[in-house]
Curated annotation (Swiss-Prot):
It is a single-pass membrane protein. Coiled coil: none annotated. It holds the Pfam family Pilin_N. Keywords: Membrane, Transmembrane, Transmembrane helix. It comes from Archaeoglobus fulgidus (strain ATCC 49558 / DSM 4304 / JCM 9628 / NBRC 100126 / VC-16). It is found in: Membrane. This is Uncharacterized protein AF_1096. InterPro entries: Flagellin/pilin_N_arc, Pilin_N_archaeal. The chain crosses the membrane at residues 13-35. The keyword Transcription regulation does not apply. The lineage of its organism: Archaea, Methanobacteriati, Methanobacteriota, Archaeoglobi, Archaeoglobales. The keyword Transmembrane helix applies. One of its GO terms (cellular component) is membrane. Disulfide bonds: none annotated.
Length: 141
């Protein structure tokens, strides 16, 4: 009986190709996980608070009462009346005396020139540029 010698030259390139393909697939998966952001970073959200707005006791004012939720930083709030920004509307009286409006505190918002009018009042968080409150109220007059 004649013994044949097996030719092993054909096996080596096949194994090499399989290893290169496997390494390429693993590398692509690692890069894709970084590119597509598989991280736990969530987009910033505005403070979540229950706010009550009512007609102010004096002319050109409304009262804002914090009923629950996150404290509101008075220095990072934009006040919009009928879609237009009101500068210096939040004062340093009442709840905002320490720049934070906390649960149970009330702040007076001055809206000059709107006395007696029914307006749309929006409070926007400056850091996220998202609304905290959107409501309609009659301004004290």
């Amino acid at each position: 009986m004649v013994r044949r010698k097996m030719d092993e030259k054909g096996v080596s390139p096949v194994i090499g190709v399989i290893l290169m393909v496997a390494i390429t697939v693993i590398l692509a998966a690692v890069i894709a996980s970084f590119v597509f952001g598989m991280s736990n970073v969530a987009p910033a959200a505005p403070p979540s608070a229950q706010l009550q707005v009512r007609t102010g006791s004096s002319a050109d004012t409304v009262e804002l009462k914090h009923m629950g939720g996150d404290p509101i930083n008075c220095t990072s709030i934009k006040v919009l009346v009928n879609g237009k920004e009101e500068s210096n509307a939040l004062g340093s009286s009442g709840g905002c005396s320490d720049n934070l409006l906390k649960v149970g505190e009330t702040e007076t918002i001055t809206l000059s020139g709107y006395g007696g009018q029914y307006v749309e009042l929006t409070l926007v968080d400056i850091q996220t540029n998202k609304p905290i409150l959107m409501t309609h109220v009659t301004v004290g007059g």
